[in-house]
């Protein structure tokens, strides 16, 4: 039931081996210690940052948070001010109980955070549902985006993908939060294909109890947060992306796709759609033996692609 049954991927095929951790990657405790907040009208938006220079904003998948990008950030901090934002309803952002959690509202939040941090423009790096959010930022605020590095995620009419509709229905029936609860209590379940482990190629290595707690504990806390963890999924409908297609065709900045091949939610054809749609596409790199959350498992690959895209 996660962004559902997360398979694997790759076109300019690559077979890099997973990188679990380097000594300088944040541990969960260090991630928590690094957290900062931006105060917006909608509430407090959590973020972490490291490095200096032009800004790069990293947008995470569902139901994760900015911790997903710890590996890429440490590898890129010498080239960018790397900022990972927790989307509204997820992670450690604290927004009003009735806050709009839709992709369009998330995109507006990203721009508002940029305003608060004094960022005229940023490179965007995204995964899963946030790939749709990144496209909306580019469509609505093209001057604020220097480049897009997009990994498997929502595209055009495949938002939300049909296999995810069952999770949305469970959220509407107040049942998805039980799935989060069980994963916090059962290490085997969370690492299985019935838990978020389905989004990883190597869940036993990636999903330690501390990592699982970092991702899912916020979604099982007070009633407001329990509802928002589900509300994020519900708010994926209606789909805003088809209406953004004309603006994407006019987006004149560099765009690169790095795509897990044959992913069950976000197949190869959607990377091809992006490649054809963006006039300055730098093409697609398909990744073999990868799953939905491969950016967390393969930070070296993400960092390599980001450096090429940014010309550093």
Predicted regions and their residues:
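Generic recognition of short, well-ordered alpha-helical segments
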Residues: 67, 71, 136, 268-269, ...
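Conserved short acidic donor-positioning loop in nucleotide-sugar-dependent glycosyltransferases
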Residues: 290
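Conserved HGGG/HGGXW glycine-rich cap/lid loop of the alpha/beta-hydrolase fold
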Residues: 49-92
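N-terminal export signals
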Residues: 5-21
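Short, flexible hinge/linker loops that cap or flank conserved catalytic cores
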Residues: 39-41, 50-51, 76, 249-251
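Flexible "cap/lid" subdomain of the alpha/beta-hydrolase fold that forms the substrate-access gate
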Residues: 22-35, 42-45, 83, 90-125, ...
